[in-house]
Regions:
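Beta-strand-rich domains and repeat architectures in extracellular enzymes and scaffolds
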Residues: 23-57
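Short glycine/acidic-enriched loop and turn motifs that connect beta-strands
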Residues: 52-56, 107-113, 167-172, 263-268
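Repeated scaffold domains used in trafficking and secretory/extracellular systems
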Residues: 31-39, 83-93, 140-156, 241-248
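Short coil/turn segments that connect the beta-strands within blades of beta-propeller domains
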Residues: 43-44, 98-100, 157-159, 253-256
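Loop/turn-rich, solvent-exposed surfaces of beta-rich toroidal or solenoidal domains
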Residues: 229-281
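Surface-exposed loop and turn segments in beta-propeller and other repeat-based domains
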Residues: 7-28, 70-84, 128-148, 189-242
């Protein structure tokens, strides 16, 4: 349905960025593929996630220093590999003293194109430079119920863990559940049986063979969420309105920031065809 209260939307465009706006650019990543997302560290570094261009089952988690110059940053070898997790569309960085942890959707399902989607759990992985971690080797797992396509976000300052998920019974909605981060990390443990594909067991990244596995998880269904917002993916605008692909989200205090934008849909030349559109709600 329509949101309650006055319409506070804006169609005001943002002016073209110039050099003074740039925090970092021309950063060398391990693979020649699009970035899936990034997180900023309090020490000033930037953490990037990207899919490998040679193995769609692999996510690269990369640490880099900001680069404000027009020169391409030299080859970056400060990264680790996460395999058989999922698409990595939205991930979260947790700082714990000198340690860093990535929260990401885990136990994804390989489709006929070799792509990994439909993540069943959220995994928490400690950063170890040069390491390769499979989806069944996380430090911790978090279960929110029988949902798929899990994508986390963390607002540590305000003790919030948000998880975006797909609900097969409400597929027209983009769904979120928000917990106290401190409560989630202490939630009771349970054994959960999930169905995924067996690539992580057989080392065959393109395998679509289903397998059931039992995973020891923090059971977030035992907690009372801070909030459980949802909104329609499409159909809420005027007749003939255009809707764009989801590109990511973040949460800070009592606000959820949701990004949509155009894709080039892998069509030759379309990326260079002129202006494109992106919206933050």
């Amino acid at each position: 349905g329509k949101p309650e209260g006055p319409d506070k939307s804006s169609t005001t465009g943002i002016d073209r960025f110039d050099a003074s706006n740039i925090f970092s650019r021309n950063t060398y990543l391990p693979d020649n593929t699009a970035m899936q997302g990034f997180n900023l560290d309090s020490d000033g570094s930037v953490w990037y996630t990207q899919l490998s261009n040679t193995n769609q089952a692999q996510l690269n988690w990369v640490r880099a220093q900001p680069n404000k110059t027009p020169d391409v940053q030299t080859e970056n070898k400060d990264y680790m590999k996460l395999t058989y997790f999922g698409h990595g569309t939205n991930t979260a960085l947790e700082e714990d003293g000198a340690d860093r942890y990535l929260w990401a959707g885990a136990y994804g399902v390989c489709n006929a194109k070799g792509q990994y989607w439909n993540e069943k759990l959220v995994g928490r992985v400690k950063y170890v430079k040069g390491a390769t971690v499979k989806t069944n080797e996380c430090n911790d797992y978090y279960y929110i119920g029988d949902y798929t396509d899990l994508h986390p976000s963390i607002d540590a300052e305000n003790d919030l863990l948000t998880i975006n998920y797909g609900d097969s019974k409400n597929s027209s909605y983009r769904c979120f559940v928000i917990y106290k981060l401190s409560e989630a990390k202490k939630a009771p443990m349970t054994n959960v049986t999930i169905t995924c594909t067996d690539g992580f067991q057989t080392d065959r990244p393109a395998s679509t063979n289903p397998v059931s596995v039992v995973v020891r998880c923090h059971d977030l269904t035992t907690l009372t969420p801070v909030a459980r917002p949802r909104f329609l993916k499409t159909g809420y605008g005027a007749s003939g309105a255009t809707y764009y692909d989801w590109q990511g989200y973040d949460v800070h205090k009592n606000r959820l920031y949701y990004t949509e934008g155009q894709s080039n849909y892998n069509l030759f030349g379309s990326f260079y065809s002129g202006s494109s559109f992106a919206y933050v709600t």
